[in-house]
């Protein structure tokens, strides 16, 4: 075991470690709006607030100007909390039924994680999924070899989820981290990057494997350089507003970032 100045890396789940393109939640949001109220949203609208807890995500979709306008046209008022509750109640069984189908690791994620563990770095994780979804996803991902040291779901803590620091800090506490400046938060969505900043950690945004690029793994594999460049810049525009310390394509590029942060920590730098 090598001694690293990095104590922990805290990963998001969908679009970061598993589920290339973060399709499990987005497609289900579209389905839940349709099933719950016969109301159509598109994938771009479903993706817009990704990273929040799912109830808050539905609320944020309802507040998008395009959705709010159509909701007013169809129902004569803005979306209410009761309507959000109904969509959420529709969403949950759909999500639980599908999430295990999206548990396959992204690229060489398992090797990257295991190499971090070999260096004595703890592996934390948190998600916008609630606990009842995570209870299905965790064992499904374990079958592929993903075994984080700790998992926090968005509804585990009474204080709430992203973009606040609570889930990241809960990981730090449970992993025995003595200094949050030795932690790295890795995420494909802005609220998760904000979470890392709010927790005083280094932050790494993922451009091509997650929600903002919205590519399937097959599209990613087949894409030429120009297509990837367009997808990369689309994601960069969204993620750079959260000013992550690093922006990389996928988890496959993370080892170089870890090495750089190790050098910076040893030189006395902090996030």
Swiss-Prot record:
Cofactor note: Binds 1 Mg(2+) ion per subunit.
Pfam families xref list: Hydrolase
Residue sites binding Mg(2+) per the record: 12, 14, 188
Reaction equation(s) it catalyzes: phosphonoacetaldehyde + H2O = acetaldehyde + phosphate + H(+)
Superkingdom of the source species: Bacteria
Active site (record annotation): 12 (nucleophile), 54 (schiff-base intermediate with substrate)
GO molecular function, one term: phosphoglycolate phosphatase activity
The keyword Hydrolase appears for this protein: yes
CC cofactor: Mg(2+)
GO annotations of cellular component type: cytosol
InterPro entries the record matches: HAD-like_hydrolase_sf, HAD-like_sf, HAD-SF_hydro_IA, HAD_sf, PGP-like_dom2, Phosphonoacetald_hydro
UniProt KW keywords: Hydrolase, Magnesium, Metal-binding, Schiff base
EC number(s) given by UniProt: 3.11.1.1
Enzyme type, top EC level: hydrolase
Keyword Metal-binding recorded: yes
GO BP: any one term: DNA repair
HAMAP family from the UniProt entry: PhnX (MF_01375)
Job of this protein: Involved in phosphonate degradation.
Quaternary assembly: Homodimer.
Family, as annotated: Belongs to the HAD-like hydrolase superfamily. PhnX family.
UniProt-listed PANTHER family: PHOSPHOGLYCOLATE PHOSPHATASE, PHOSPHONOACETALDEHYDE HYDROLASE
UniProt name for this protein: Phosphonoacetaldehyde hydrolase
Organism the protein comes from: Aliivibrio salmonicida (strain LFI1238)
